Design a protein with these regions (language model features):
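ATP-binding N-terminal substructure of ATP-dependent carboxylate-amine bond-forming enzymes
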Residues: 1-143
Length: 145
C-alpha cells in the first residue's frame, strides 16, 4: 500500500508527533508498505513529491529536518495569516489524495480536534482514526473534564 504518515503540525506536541510518526513509518516499511512521512504544515518540495511513494529515504533524516523546522512554526503561522496561504504545506493534500490511506500521526490541535479529518472527508481522502465529528466531540469533552 502507498501510505502517507502525517506528522508535525503546529501544536506544542509537534515533536511527539514527529517521533511517533517516524516509528510508525519505519514499522510500515518493515511490513512491506510504501510509506513515507510528511510534515502537514511545512510539506515538501515538488521534486521530492514526484518520487514520494517510491523513494525509500532515510526516515530518521526526514524527521530530523522536520524537527529543525519547529523553531519556524510561529513565524510561518504569522506569514500565512498575512498571505492567506492556509494551513496545509506544499504538496500535502496532493500526496494524501494519491495515497491508499493516510496514517494520522498528529497530536494536539488540528490533529485531534477533527479539522484535518473534516478536510480529508470533503476531499475523499481515506485516513486512520475516528471521523471528524467523533474527534471534535472528544476534544470538546476532554476540555470540560
Amino acid at each position: 500500500m502507498n501510505i502517507v504518515v502525517l506528522a508535525g503540525g503546529t501544536s506544542t506536541e509537534r515533536d511527539i508527533s514527529i517521533l511517533t510518526s517516524t516509528k510508525v513509518c519505519e514499522s510500515l516499511r518493515r511490513n512491506g508498505h510504501n510509506a513515507n512521512i510528511i510534515d502537514v504544515f511545512f510539506g515538501i518540495e515538488d521534486k521530492e513529491a514526484e518520487s514520494f511513494f517510491t523513494n525509500n529515504n532515510d526516515v530518521e533524516k526526514t524527521a530530523e529536518a522536520m524537527r529543525k523546522n519547529t523553531v519556524n512554526v510561529e513565524d510561518e503561522l504569522e506569514a500565512r495569516k498575512k498571505s492567506g496561504k492556509g494551513f496545509f504545506g506544499d504538496n500535502v493534500l496532493a500526496l494524501c489524495s494519491k495515497a491508499d490511506i493516510v496514517f494520522m500521526g498528529l497530536h494536539g490541535s488540528n490533529g485531534e480536534d477533527g479539522k484535518i479529518q473534516a478536510a480529508f472527508e470533503l476531499m475523499g481522502i481515506k485516513y486512520t482514526g475516528t471521523d471528524y465529528i467523533s474527534s471534535a466531540i472528544s476534544k470538546i469533552g476532554r476540555a470540560h473534564v
